[in-house]
Protein backbone atom coordinates (compact mmCIF):
# COMPACT_ATOMS: atom_id res chain seq x y z
CA UNK A 1 0.00 0.00 0.00
CA UNK A 2 1.38 3.40 -1.00
CA UNK A 3 1.68 6.30 1.43
CA UNK A 4 -1.03 8.16 -0.48
CA UNK A 5 -3.44 5.23 -0.23
CA UNK A 6 -2.76 4.95 3.50
CA UNK A 7 -3.47 8.66 3.93
CA UNK A 8 -6.77 8.39 2.03
CA UNK A 9 -7.85 5.47 4.22
CA UNK A 10 -6.94 7.39 7.38
CA UNK A 11 -9.04 10.37 6.28
CA UNK A 12 -11.97 8.03 5.63
CA UNK A 13 -11.48 6.28 8.95
CA UNK A 14 -11.68 9.50 11.01
CA UNK A 15 -14.83 10.59 9.18
CA UNK A 16 -13.25 13.38 7.14
CA UNK A 17 -14.80 11.95 3.94
CA UNK A 18 -18.59 11.61 3.91
CA UNK A 19 -20.96 10.45 1.19
CA UNK A 20 -24.58 11.58 0.76
CA UNK A 21 -26.05 14.86 -0.51
CA UNK A 22 -24.34 18.03 0.70
CA UNK A 23 -24.57 21.72 -0.19
CA UNK A 24 -21.16 23.23 -0.86
CA UNK A 25 -19.88 26.79 -0.37
CA UNK A 26 -20.29 27.32 -4.11
CA UNK A 27 -24.04 26.60 -3.79
CA UNK A 28 -24.11 23.30 -5.67
CA UNK A 29 -25.10 19.95 -4.12
CA UNK A 30 -22.45 17.24 -3.99
CA UNK A 31 -22.55 13.46 -3.32
CA UNK A 32 -19.35 13.79 -1.27
CA UNK A 33 -18.39 16.12 1.56
CA UNK A 34 -14.85 16.47 2.84
CA UNK A 35 -14.44 17.89 6.35
CA UNK A 36 -10.74 18.33 7.05
CA UNK A 37 -11.29 20.34 10.23
CA UNK A 38 -11.13 17.02 12.07
CA UNK A 39 -7.41 16.55 11.40
CA UNK A 40 -6.47 18.98 14.21
CA UNK A 41 -7.49 16.25 16.66
CA UNK A 42 -5.01 13.79 15.12
CA UNK A 43 -1.48 15.22 15.59
CA UNK A 44 0.35 12.42 13.79
CA UNK A 45 -1.98 12.69 10.79
CA UNK A 46 -1.63 16.48 10.75
CA UNK A 47 2.16 16.13 10.79
CA UNK A 48 2.06 13.53 8.01
CA UNK A 49 -0.12 15.76 5.81
CA UNK A 50 2.09 18.79 6.39
CA UNK A 51 5.30 16.91 5.56
CA UNK A 52 3.83 15.31 2.45
CA UNK A 53 2.46 18.63 1.19
CA UNK A 54 5.88 20.27 1.09
CA UNK A 55 7.73 17.21 -0.23
CA UNK A 56 5.24 16.91 -3.10
CA UNK A 57 6.13 20.36 -4.47
CA UNK A 58 8.35 20.51 -7.58
CA UNK A 59 11.74 22.30 -7.37
CA UNK A 60 10.31 25.12 -9.49
CA UNK A 61 7.96 26.13 -6.65
CA UNK A 62 10.27 28.39 -4.66
CA UNK A 63 9.01 30.61 -1.84
CA UNK A 64 10.15 32.67 1.15
CA UNK A 65 7.07 32.49 3.40
CA UNK A 66 3.88 30.45 3.72
CA UNK A 67 0.30 31.47 4.43
CA UNK A 68 -2.57 29.13 5.24
CA UNK A 69 -6.07 29.92 4.00
CA UNK A 70 -8.31 30.64 7.03
CA UNK A 71 -9.31 28.60 8.87
CA UNK A 72 -8.82 24.86 8.30
CA UNK A 73 -5.47 25.26 6.54
CA UNK A 74 -3.98 27.35 9.37
CA UNK A 75 -2.85 24.36 11.48
CA UNK A 76 -1.40 22.70 8.37
CA UNK A 77 0.55 25.85 7.53
CA UNK A 78 1.71 26.14 11.15
CA UNK A 79 3.16 22.62 11.18
CA UNK A 80 4.80 23.25 7.79
CA UNK A 81 6.36 26.43 9.17
CA UNK A 82 7.62 24.89 12.41
CA UNK A 83 8.84 21.62 10.86
CA UNK A 84 10.71 23.28 8.00
CA UNK A 85 11.81 26.55 9.57
CA UNK A 86 9.82 28.59 7.04
CA UNK A 87 8.36 31.93 8.21
CA UNK A 88 4.57 32.00 8.26
CA UNK A 89 2.10 34.81 7.67
CA UNK A 90 -1.53 34.96 8.74
CA UNK A 91 -4.35 36.49 6.76
CA UNK A 92 -7.13 37.99 8.86
CA UNK A 93 -10.50 36.92 7.53
CA UNK A 94 -12.10 39.82 9.39
CA UNK A 95 -9.98 42.96 9.67
CA UNK A 96 -10.28 44.51 13.14
CA UNK A 97 -11.17 48.20 13.52
CA UNK A 98 -8.67 48.57 16.36
CA UNK A 99 -4.97 47.90 16.82
CA UNK A 100 -3.00 47.94 13.57
CA UNK A 101 -6.03 46.95 11.43
CA UNK A 102 -3.79 44.80 9.23
CA UNK A 103 -5.11 42.22 6.76
CA UNK A 104 -1.80 40.33 6.82
CA UNK A 105 0.01 39.62 10.09
CA UNK A 106 3.67 38.63 10.32
CA UNK A 107 7.11 39.80 9.26
CA UNK A 108 7.87 39.99 5.56
CA UNK A 109 9.58 42.10 2.93
CA UNK A 110 8.16 43.52 -0.27
CA UNK A 111 8.65 41.26 -3.33
CA UNK A 112 9.11 38.10 -1.25
CA UNK A 113 7.26 35.05 -2.60
CA UNK A 114 4.48 33.48 -0.54
CA UNK A 115 3.21 29.91 -0.92
CA UNK A 116 -0.50 29.57 -0.14
CA UNK A 117 -1.50 26.39 1.68
CA UNK A 118 -5.09 25.12 1.44
CA UNK A 119 -6.85 21.99 2.63
CA UNK A 120 -9.45 21.67 -0.13
CA UNK A 121 -10.03 23.40 -3.47
CA UNK A 122 -13.27 23.45 -5.45
CA UNK A 123 -13.45 26.66 -7.49
CA UNK A 124 -10.29 28.21 -6.03
CA UNK A 125 -12.21 31.18 -4.58
CA UNK A 126 -10.74 30.85 -1.08
CA UNK A 127 -7.20 30.80 -2.46
CA UNK A 128 -7.90 33.93 -4.50
CA UNK A 129 -9.41 35.63 -1.43
CA UNK A 130 -6.11 35.01 0.36
CA UNK A 131 -3.88 35.91 -2.59
CA UNK A 132 -5.49 39.35 -3.03
CA UNK A 133 -4.43 40.89 0.33
CA UNK A 134 -1.02 39.19 0.12
CA UNK A 135 -0.41 40.81 -3.24
CA UNK A 136 -1.80 44.10 -1.97
CA UNK A 137 1.02 44.35 0.60
CA UNK A 138 3.68 43.69 -2.02
CA UNK A 139 4.13 39.91 -1.81
CA UNK A 140 4.36 37.69 -4.89
CA UNK A 141 1.97 34.74 -5.11
CA UNK A 142 2.61 32.23 -7.89
CA UNK A 143 1.94 28.84 -6.27
CA UNK A 144 -0.61 27.19 -4.01
CA UNK A 145 -0.53 23.68 -2.60
CA UNK A 146 -3.67 21.79 -1.58
CA UNK A 147 -4.35 18.49 0.15
CA UNK A 148 -7.41 17.58 -1.94
CA UNK A 149 -8.44 18.94 -5.35
CA UNK A 150 -12.14 18.38 -6.07
CA UNK A 151 -11.38 18.79 -9.80
CA UNK A 152 -14.14 21.31 -10.39
CA UNK A 153 -12.28 24.12 -12.09
CA UNK A 154 -10.12 25.36 -9.25
CA UNK A 155 -6.87 24.62 -11.08
CA UNK A 156 -8.03 26.49 -14.19
CA UNK A 157 -9.49 29.43 -12.27
CA UNK A 158 -6.27 29.89 -10.31
CA UNK A 159 -4.12 29.61 -13.43
CA UNK A 160 -6.11 32.47 -14.97
CA UNK A 161 -5.06 34.54 -11.95
CA UNK A 162 -1.37 33.65 -12.17
CA UNK A 163 -1.36 30.89 -9.54
CA UNK A 164 -0.23 27.31 -10.22
CA UNK A 165 -2.06 24.73 -8.10
CA UNK A 166 -0.16 21.70 -6.76
CA UNK A 167 -2.43 18.91 -5.47
CA UNK A 168 -1.60 15.99 -3.18
CA UNK A 169 -4.81 14.06 -3.80
CA UNK A 170 -7.27 14.28 -6.68
CA UNK A 171 -10.87 13.53 -5.73
CA UNK A 172 -11.20 10.85 -8.43
CA UNK A 173 -8.12 9.07 -7.06
CA UNK A 174 -9.54 9.22 -3.54
CA UNK A 175 -12.82 7.62 -4.58
CA UNK A 176 -11.02 4.98 -6.66
CA UNK A 177 -8.85 3.95 -3.70
CA UNK A 178 -11.86 3.80 -1.36
CA UNK A 179 -13.73 1.59 -3.83
CA UNK A 180 -10.72 -0.70 -4.36
CA UNK A 181 -10.29 -1.09 -0.60
CA UNK A 182 -13.94 -1.94 -0.17
CA UNK A 183 -14.88 1.22 1.71
CA UNK A 184 -17.58 2.34 -0.76
CA UNK A 185 -19.80 0.64 -3.34
CA UNK A 186 -19.27 0.89 -7.11
CA UNK A 187 -22.48 2.92 -7.40
CA UNK A 188 -21.00 5.64 -5.18
CA UNK A 189 -17.98 5.95 -7.47
CA UNK A 190 -20.17 6.06 -10.58
CA UNK A 191 -22.39 8.67 -8.95
CA UNK A 192 -19.41 10.86 -8.10
CA UNK A 193 -17.83 10.60 -11.55
CA UNK A 194 -21.15 11.63 -13.10
CA UNK A 195 -21.34 14.58 -10.70
CA UNK A 196 -17.84 15.72 -11.63
CA UNK A 197 -18.63 15.39 -15.33
CA UNK A 198 -21.67 17.64 -14.89
CA UNK A 199 -19.81 20.15 -12.72
CA UNK A 200 -16.43 20.40 -14.39
CA UNK A 201 -16.06 24.13 -13.87
CA UNK A 202 -17.52 25.86 -10.83
CA UNK A 203 -17.40 29.60 -11.39
CA UNK A 204 -15.50 31.72 -8.90
CA UNK A 205 -17.64 34.20 -6.97
CA UNK A 206 -16.36 37.68 -7.68
CA UNK A 207 -13.50 38.40 -5.32
CA UNK A 208 -13.53 42.03 -4.31
CA UNK A 209 -10.18 43.49 -5.17
CA UNK A 210 -8.65 45.56 -2.40
CA UNK A 211 -9.01 49.24 -3.07
CA UNK A 212 -5.72 50.82 -4.05
CA UNK A 213 -4.18 52.82 -1.26
CA UNK A 214 -4.53 56.54 -1.89
CA UNK A 215 -1.29 58.27 -2.72
CA UNK A 216 0.36 59.72 0.36
CA UNK A 217 0.62 63.48 0.01
CA UNK A 218 3.77 65.15 1.27
CA UNK A 219 3.81 68.07 3.66
CA UNK A 220 4.33 70.56 0.80
CA UNK A 221 1.10 69.54 -0.93
CA UNK A 222 -0.75 69.37 2.36
CA UNK A 223 0.44 72.84 3.34
CA UNK A 224 -1.27 74.20 0.23
CA UNK A 225 -4.51 72.48 1.29
CA UNK A 226 -4.51 73.77 4.87
CA UNK A 227 -7.04 76.51 5.60
CA UNK A 228 -5.45 77.53 8.90
CA UNK A 229 -2.41 79.87 8.85
CA UNK A 230 -0.71 78.12 11.75
CA UNK A 231 -1.32 74.75 10.11
CA UNK A 232 0.37 76.02 6.94
CA UNK A 233 3.25 77.41 8.98
CA UNK A 234 3.76 74.11 10.82
CA UNK A 235 3.85 72.13 7.56
CA UNK A 236 6.41 74.60 6.19
CA UNK A 237 8.59 74.38 9.31
CA UNK A 238 8.58 70.58 9.17
CA UNK A 239 9.70 70.68 5.54
CA UNK A 240 12.41 73.29 5.97
CA UNK A 241 13.88 71.76 9.15
CA UNK A 242 13.18 68.16 8.08
CA UNK A 243 11.66 67.29 11.43
CA UNK A 244 8.28 66.03 12.62
CA UNK A 245 9.35 65.88 16.27
CA UNK A 246 7.42 67.61 19.05
CA UNK A 247 9.02 67.82 22.49
CA UNK A 248 6.63 67.38 25.42
CA UNK A 249 8.50 69.65 27.85
CA UNK A 250 6.90 68.35 31.05
CA UNK A 251 9.62 69.58 33.41
CA UNK A 252 9.36 70.88 36.97
CA UNK A 253 10.14 74.57 36.52
CA UNK A 254 9.92 77.36 33.98
CA UNK A 255 13.71 77.74 34.12
CA UNK A 256 14.17 74.07 33.15
CA UNK A 257 11.65 74.43 30.35
CA UNK A 258 13.39 77.44 28.82
CA UNK A 259 16.74 75.68 29.11
CA UNK A 260 15.68 72.46 27.39
CA UNK A 261 13.75 74.42 24.74
CA UNK A 262 16.97 76.19 23.79
CA UNK A 263 18.96 72.93 23.76
CA UNK A 264 16.60 70.87 21.60
CA UNK A 265 15.11 73.74 19.60
CA UNK A 266 17.11 72.96 16.43
CA UNK A 267 15.67 69.42 16.35
CA UNK A 268 11.94 70.10 16.79
CA UNK A 269 9.04 71.57 14.87
CA UNK A 270 6.86 71.97 17.95
CA UNK A 271 7.28 72.42 21.71
CA UNK A 272 4.42 71.22 23.93
CA UNK A 273 3.97 72.86 27.33
CA UNK A 274 1.84 72.40 30.44
CA UNK A 275 2.21 75.91 31.78
CA UNK A 276 0.01 75.29 34.82
CA UNK A 277 2.54 72.85 36.33
CA UNK A 278 5.30 75.48 36.56
CA UNK A 279 5.66 76.80 40.16
CA UNK A 280 8.01 79.62 39.09
CA UNK A 281 5.85 80.95 36.26
CA UNK A 282 6.18 84.70 35.76
CA UNK A 283 4.37 87.08 33.38
CA UNK A 284 7.44 87.29 31.12
CA UNK A 285 7.63 83.50 30.64
CA UNK A 286 5.67 83.66 27.40
CA UNK A 287 7.89 86.31 25.82
CA UNK A 288 11.05 84.40 26.82
CA UNK A 289 9.76 81.17 25.31
CA UNK A 290 8.55 83.05 22.25
CA UNK A 291 12.07 84.43 21.69
CA UNK A 292 13.57 80.90 21.83
CA UNK A 293 10.89 79.59 19.44
CA UNK A 294 11.61 82.37 16.95
CA UNK A 295 15.36 81.76 17.28
CA UNK A 296 15.10 78.03 16.49
CA UNK A 297 12.01 78.28 14.28
CA UNK A 298 9.57 76.00 16.08
CA UNK A 299 5.97 76.59 17.18
CA UNK A 300 4.60 76.56 20.74
CA UNK A 301 1.75 74.23 21.65
CA UNK A 302 0.12 74.75 25.06
CA UNK A 303 -1.44 71.41 26.00
CA UNK A 304 -4.27 73.03 27.98
CA UNK A 305 -6.94 70.51 26.96
CA UNK A 306 -9.82 72.99 27.23
CA UNK A 307 -13.06 71.18 28.06
CA UNK A 308 -15.61 73.72 29.37
CA UNK A 309 -18.43 75.63 27.69
CA UNK A 310 -17.63 78.28 25.09
CA UNK A 311 -17.87 81.34 27.32
CA UNK A 312 -15.62 79.86 30.01
CA UNK A 313 -12.88 78.65 27.67
CA UNK A 314 -12.80 82.08 26.04
CA UNK A 315 -11.81 83.60 29.38
CA UNK A 316 -9.40 80.76 30.19
CA UNK A 317 -7.68 81.21 26.83
CA UNK A 318 -7.29 84.98 26.94
CA UNK A 319 -7.12 85.79 30.64
CA UNK A 320 -5.95 84.48 33.98
CA UNK A 321 -2.33 84.59 35.01
CA UNK A 322 -1.10 82.57 32.02
CA UNK A 323 -2.57 84.61 29.12
CA UNK A 324 -2.10 81.64 26.78
CA UNK A 325 -3.43 83.52 23.76
CA UNK A 326 -0.47 85.91 23.90
CA UNK A 327 2.31 83.36 23.35
CA UNK A 328 0.97 79.93 22.27
CA UNK A 329 0.62 79.28 18.53
CA UNK A 330 -1.47 76.18 19.10
CA UNK A 331 -3.86 74.94 21.80
CA UNK A 332 -6.01 71.84 22.09
CA UNK A 333 -9.48 70.96 23.35
CA UNK A 334 -11.78 68.08 24.17
CA UNK A 335 -15.13 68.02 22.36
CA UNK A 336 -17.07 66.62 25.31
CA UNK A 337 -18.95 69.92 25.71
CA UNK A 338 -19.90 70.06 22.03
CA UNK A 339 -18.98 72.40 19.14
CA UNK A 340 -19.54 75.49 21.30
CA UNK A 341 -16.07 75.04 22.77
CA UNK A 342 -14.57 75.55 19.31
CA UNK A 343 -16.73 78.62 18.74
CA UNK A 344 -15.47 80.14 21.99
CA UNK A 345 -11.78 79.48 21.34
CA UNK A 346 -12.12 80.52 17.71
CA UNK A 347 -13.57 83.88 18.76
CA UNK A 348 -10.23 84.83 20.32
CA UNK A 349 -7.79 82.64 18.38
CA UNK A 350 -8.80 83.32 14.78
CA UNK A 351 -8.01 87.07 14.81
CA UNK A 352 -4.51 86.18 16.06
CA UNK A 353 -3.98 83.47 13.43
CA UNK A 354 -3.80 80.71 16.04
CA UNK A 355 -4.58 77.02 15.52
CA UNK A 356 -6.54 74.37 17.43
CA UNK A 357 -5.99 70.62 17.75
CA UNK A 358 -8.96 68.50 18.80
CA UNK A 359 -8.39 65.53 21.11
CA UNK A 360 -9.80 62.75 18.95
CA UNK A 361 -7.92 59.99 20.81
CA UNK A 362 -5.68 59.65 23.86
CA UNK A 363 -2.69 57.42 24.60
CA UNK A 364 -3.67 56.38 28.14
CA UNK A 365 -5.05 52.91 28.83
CA UNK A 366 -8.84 52.74 29.27
CA UNK A 367 -9.56 56.23 27.93
CA UNK A 368 -13.03 56.92 26.51
CA UNK A 369 -11.99 58.90 23.42
CA UNK A 370 -12.85 56.17 20.93
CA UNK A 371 -15.42 55.26 18.27
CA UNK A 372 -18.31 57.73 18.12
CA UNK A 373 -16.38 60.27 20.18
CA UNK A 374 -13.58 60.27 17.61
CA UNK A 375 -16.10 60.56 14.77
CA UNK A 376 -17.72 63.55 16.50
CA UNK A 377 -14.33 65.27 16.78
CA UNK A 378 -13.76 64.77 13.05
CA UNK A 379 -17.18 66.21 12.22
CA UNK A 380 -16.56 69.31 14.36
CA UNK A 381 -13.11 69.78 12.81
CA UNK A 382 -14.61 69.64 9.33
CA UNK A 383 -17.10 72.37 10.23
CA UNK A 384 -14.31 74.62 11.60
CA UNK A 385 -11.40 73.80 9.27
CA UNK A 386 -10.32 77.46 9.19
CA UNK A 387 -9.40 77.24 12.89
CA UNK A 388 -9.05 73.51 13.63
CA UNK A 389 -5.73 72.49 12.09
CA UNK A 390 -5.69 68.85 13.16
CA UNK A 391 -5.95 66.28 15.93
CA UNK A 392 -4.27 64.67 18.85
CA UNK A 393 -4.66 61.07 17.71
CA UNK A 394 -3.24 57.62 18.39
CA UNK A 395 -4.18 55.47 15.40
CA UNK A 396 -5.96 57.56 12.74
CA UNK A 397 -5.35 54.87 10.12
CA UNK A 398 -7.93 52.69 11.91
CA UNK A 399 -10.70 55.25 12.34
CA UNK A 400 -14.13 53.89 11.40
CA UNK A 401 -15.11 57.33 10.14
CA UNK A 402 -12.29 57.15 7.62
CA UNK A 403 -9.04 59.00 7.34
CA UNK A 404 -9.67 62.74 7.45
CA UNK A 405 -8.59 65.41 5.02
CA UNK A 406 -4.85 65.74 4.28
CA UNK A 407 -5.08 69.39 5.31
CA UNK A 408 -5.39 68.20 8.91
CA UNK A 409 -2.29 67.39 10.98
CA UNK A 410 -2.15 64.35 13.28
CA UNK A 411 0.09 64.54 16.35
CA UNK A 412 0.56 61.42 18.46
CA UNK A 413 1.76 61.36 22.10
CA UNK A 414 3.31 58.41 23.90
CA UNK A 415 6.26 57.83 21.56
CA UNK A 416 9.49 56.12 22.61
CA UNK A 417 12.19 54.11 20.87
CA UNK A 418 10.73 50.90 22.32
CA UNK A 419 7.07 49.95 22.74
CA UNK A 420 5.75 49.68 26.31
CA UNK A 421 3.97 51.61 29.03
CA UNK A 422 4.31 53.13 32.47
CA UNK A 423 2.74 52.48 35.86
CA UNK A 424 0.10 55.18 35.29
CA UNK A 425 -1.36 53.76 32.09
CA UNK A 426 0.60 55.66 29.44
CA UNK A 427 1.08 53.49 26.35
CA UNK A 428 4.18 53.95 24.18
CA UNK A 429 4.72 53.27 20.47
CA UNK A 430 7.80 53.65 18.27
CA UNK A 431 8.29 56.54 15.80
CA UNK A 432 8.18 54.13 12.84
CA UNK A 433 4.94 52.50 14.00
CA UNK A 434 3.24 55.83 14.73
CA UNK A 435 4.07 57.35 11.33
CA UNK A 436 4.00 54.44 8.85
CA UNK A 437 1.43 52.09 10.40
CA UNK A 438 -0.85 54.33 12.46
CA UNK A 439 -1.06 57.21 9.98
CA UNK A 440 0.19 60.07 12.14
CA UNK A 441 2.38 63.04 11.14
CA UNK A 442 4.06 64.30 14.30
CA UNK A 443 5.65 62.25 17.08
CA UNK A 444 5.29 63.73 20.56
CA UNK A 445 8.16 62.64 22.80
CA UNK A 446 8.53 63.61 26.46
CA UNK A 447 10.41 61.52 28.98
CA UNK A 448 12.39 59.76 26.26
CA UNK A 449 14.20 63.08 25.67
CA UNK A 450 13.98 65.10 28.88
CA UNK A 451 15.20 62.19 31.03
CA UNK A 452 18.08 61.40 28.66
CA UNK A 453 21.68 62.05 29.66
CA UNK A 454 22.06 64.27 26.59
CA UNK A 455 18.62 65.61 25.58
CA UNK A 456 19.91 67.34 22.42
CA UNK A 457 21.57 64.19 21.05
CA UNK A 458 18.56 62.05 21.94
CA UNK A 459 16.20 64.56 20.32
CA UNK A 460 18.32 64.31 17.16
CA UNK A 461 17.91 60.51 17.18
CA UNK A 462 14.13 60.84 17.49
CA UNK A 463 14.12 63.49 14.77
CA UNK A 464 15.97 61.18 12.36
CA UNK A 465 13.70 58.21 13.12
CA UNK A 466 10.54 60.27 12.76
CA UNK A 467 11.61 61.95 9.54
CA UNK A 468 12.83 58.71 7.95
CA UNK A 469 9.47 57.14 8.78
CA UNK A 470 7.73 60.08 7.06
CA UNK A 471 9.91 59.65 3.95
CA UNK A 472 9.17 55.91 3.93
CA UNK A 473 5.44 56.56 4.16
CA UNK A 474 5.59 59.01 1.25
CA UNK A 475 7.40 56.42 -0.90
CA UNK A 476 4.76 53.71 -0.41
From Swiss-Prot:
What's an example Gene Ontology biological process for this entry?
Answer: 'de novo' pyrimidine nucleobase biosynthetic process
Q: Which Pfam families match?
A: OMPdecase, Pribosyltran
Catalytic reaction equation(s) = orotidine 5'-phosphate + diphosphate = orotate + 5-phospho-alpha-D-ribose 1-diphosphate; orotidine 5'-phosphate + H(+) = UMP + CO2
EC number per UniProt: 2.4.2.10, 4.1.1.23
> InterPro entries of this UniProt entry?
Aldolase_TIM, OMPdecase, OMPdecase_AS, OMPdeCOase_dom, OPRT, Or_phspho_trans_dom, PRibTrfase_dom, PRTase-like
On whether Plastid is a keyword of this UniProt record, the answer is: no
What Gene Ontology molecular-function terms does this entry list?
orotate phosphoribosyltransferase activity; orotidine-5'-phosphate decarboxylase activity
* Catalytic residues identified in the record: 305
Query: Which keywords belong to this entry?
Result: Decarboxylase, Glycosyltransferase, Lyase, Multifunctional enzyme, Pyrimidine biosynthesis, Transferase
Q: In which pathway does it act?
A: Pyrimidine metabolism; UMP biosynthesis via de novo pathway; UMP from orotate: step 1/2; Pyrimidine metabolism; UMP biosynthesis via de novo pathway; UMP from orotate: step 2/2
Q: Which domain of life is it from?
A: Eukaryota
Q: What is the similarity comment for this entry?
A: In the N-terminal section; belongs to the purine/pyrimidine phosphoribosyltransferase family. In the C-terminal section; belongs to the OMP decarboxylase family.
HAMAP family per UniProt:
PyrE
Name-wise, this protein is Uridine 5'-monophosphate synthase
Q: Which organism is it from?
A: Arabidopsis thaliana (Mouse-ear cress)
As recorded in Swiss-Prot or TrEMBL, the protein's gene is named: PYRE-F
Amino acid sequence: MSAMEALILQLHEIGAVKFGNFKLKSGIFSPVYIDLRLIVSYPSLLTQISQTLISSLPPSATFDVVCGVPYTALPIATVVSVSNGIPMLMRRKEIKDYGTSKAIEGIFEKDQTCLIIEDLVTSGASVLETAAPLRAVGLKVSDAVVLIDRQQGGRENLAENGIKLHSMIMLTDMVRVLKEKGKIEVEVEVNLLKFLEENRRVSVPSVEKPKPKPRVLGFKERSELSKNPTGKKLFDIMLKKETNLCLAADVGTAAELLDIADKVGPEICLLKTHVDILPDFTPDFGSKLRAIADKHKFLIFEDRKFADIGNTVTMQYEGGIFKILEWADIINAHVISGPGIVDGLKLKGMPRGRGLLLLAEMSSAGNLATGDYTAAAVKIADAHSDFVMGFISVNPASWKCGYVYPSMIHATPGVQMVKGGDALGQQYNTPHSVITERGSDIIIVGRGIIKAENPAETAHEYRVQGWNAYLEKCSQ
